[in-house]
Amino acid sequence: MMARRDPKSWAKRLVRAQTLQKQRRAPVGPRAPPPDEEDPRLKCKNCGAFGHTARSTRCPMKCWKAALVPATLGKKEGKENLKPWKPRVEANPGPLNKDKGEKEERPRQQDPQRKALLHMFSGKPPEKPLPNGKGSTESSDHLRVASGPMPVHTTSKRPRVDPVLADRSAAEMSGRGSVLASLSPLRKASLSSSSSLGPKERQTGAAADIPQPAVRHQGREPLLVVKPTHSRPEGGCREVPQAASKTHGLLQAARPQAQDKRPAVTSQPCPPAATHSLGLGSNLSFGPGAKRPAQAPIQACLNFPKKPRLGPFQIPESAIQGGELGAPENLQPPPAATELGPSTSPQMGRRTPAQVPSVDRQPPHSTPCLPTAQACTMSHHSAASHDGAQPLRVLFRRLENGRWSSSLLAAPSFHSPEKPGAFLAQSPHVSEKSEAPCVRVPPSVLYEDLQVSSSSEDSDSDLE
């Protein structure tokens, strides 16, 4: 009988029995879902996703074929551009595009304003715009700037200048013009004086190392210029008065008449290098600068003795026989006038080229033997160009404060030579020992007196 039983049926019975036993042993509760279904309460430890465990075949860490890109839960149209490489072409443009097209078609409102502003800066009158407004856009197309701000509308009138400022500026311009006009004669005179040095520059040997100063010349009177040099020649001074008397006589014969009125030229304090022409009766006082000038020496034609000290200033009759000297404007004698009183030589003249080497072409001049003062007779032009004029004589005097003052002495030929007392009465400081022969002295006596240095007082004490 056992053989008659089918093994298949026996197996079926066994499976049923096992299933029944499992059903009995199962706890009472919710049934677990099948393995293919997702449970959102589960979380995979490998990938961190919900719906499966680490042992599930849905985990992408174990089965790469099942790893899919997570899709979005829901699509929302209009949030993102699925094809950004293709620009969106809209059949109906929006309101912004419509406004932009209208602005390009119609003329711009700010074009007339820009044109008016352009005409205001250029100075041209603005043109009247056409009624339709199309003519203004054609001429100002090059001025359009898409990103530029609109200009402020202004009128084409230029700003008016304040009358107070205009009057002040006019006054300043007139003041400058008067200053230039006052300086122009001096500049012209400097050119004329430099060009007139030709006739006399070859006749004289004594010259200075400084440039020719600007001289103002009026009329036919000879010009007086003081020429300082570095040193004095140490040759004898007895030969100079003889040549001076000859020159003085020739000048008197060539110029029989002299002008009574001579223009007075204002003089200002200046260094010895710059001197101006002097009129009759004018005084020139100048002081040395704070520093020693490099090329401002003092010209001394003769040797001056240091000792003995001369008395009051006097001019002998022999020095003014050529004519009566003009009355100069006397200076107040300083306390040291008795010790430093200058003296004049009886004869005036010029040096010959053999006595003094010519360094620079300058007008002729000569000075007598004076310890602290000198008289200089000079003429820039020839005798033919100054008929009726006499050479003038400049007298330099040293003051107490270290400055020098100069007075102008004239010697016209039409006066009688028997009246020298007129000048002597007006100038009481004339040396009585002016006819004394000159003595050789060091060439730096007058040069040191005209310089400002700490040893000026010591030199005065040594001379005393």
Swiss-Prot record:
Residues 180-197 have a biased composition (Low complexity). Pfam families: zf-CCHC_6. It comes from the Eukaryota. InterPro entries: FAM90 (IPR039213), Znf-CCHC_6 (IPR041670). Signal peptide: none annotated. Residues 1-42, 70-389, 415-437 are annotated as: Disordered. Residues 74-89, 97-114 have a biased composition (Basic and acidic residues). Belongs to the FAM90 family. This is Protein FAM90A16.
